[in-house]
């Protein structure tokens, strides 16, 4: 359930700080969120796919660690990012 190259470039363009930015925390978080959403849709029709479910949990943990880092670094950037991505605050 990977995302297409075009969709990834679109996410990079929307969340990048400058034109050459492809790996900032916000961009990584946006790409991970897209992958998580794709896997969530996959599980609606393939509920017995436990191997992919483990992969989903790994992705969610990675995104949570990135969000913790962003929150420590800049709270306003964190709040802006989670509102753009449509995800809940972490505690």
UniProtKB/Swiss-Prot annotation:
Q: Which SMART domains match?
A: Ribosomal_S15
Superkingdom assignment: Bacteria
The GO biological-process annotations, alphabetized, read as: translation
Give me the disulphide-bonded residues: none
Query: Which keywords does UniProt give here?
Result: Ribonucleoprotein, Ribosomal protein, RNA-binding, rRNA-binding
Q: Kindly give the Pfam families that the UniProt entry links to this protein.
A: Ribosomal_S15
User: What GO MF terms are annotated?
Assistant: rRNA binding; structural constituent of ribosome
Q: How does it assemble?
A: Part of the 30S ribosomal subunit. Forms a bridge to the 50S subunit in the 70S ribosome, contacting the 23S rRNA.
- Identification of the protein by name: Small ribosomal subunit protein uS15
The species is Rickettsia bellii (strain OSU 85-389)
């Amino acid at each position: 359930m990977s995302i297409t190259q075009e969709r990834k470039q679109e996410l990079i363009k929307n969340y990048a700080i400058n034109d050459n930015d492809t790996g900032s925390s916000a961009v990584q978080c946006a790409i991970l969120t897209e992958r998580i959403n794709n896997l969530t849709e996959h599980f609606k029709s393939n509920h017995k796919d436990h191997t992919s479910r483990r992969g989903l949990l790994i992705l969610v943990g990675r995104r949570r660690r990135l969000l913790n880092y962003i929150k420590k670094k800049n709270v306003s950037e964190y709040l802006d990012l989670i509102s753009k991505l449509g995800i809940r605050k972490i505690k």
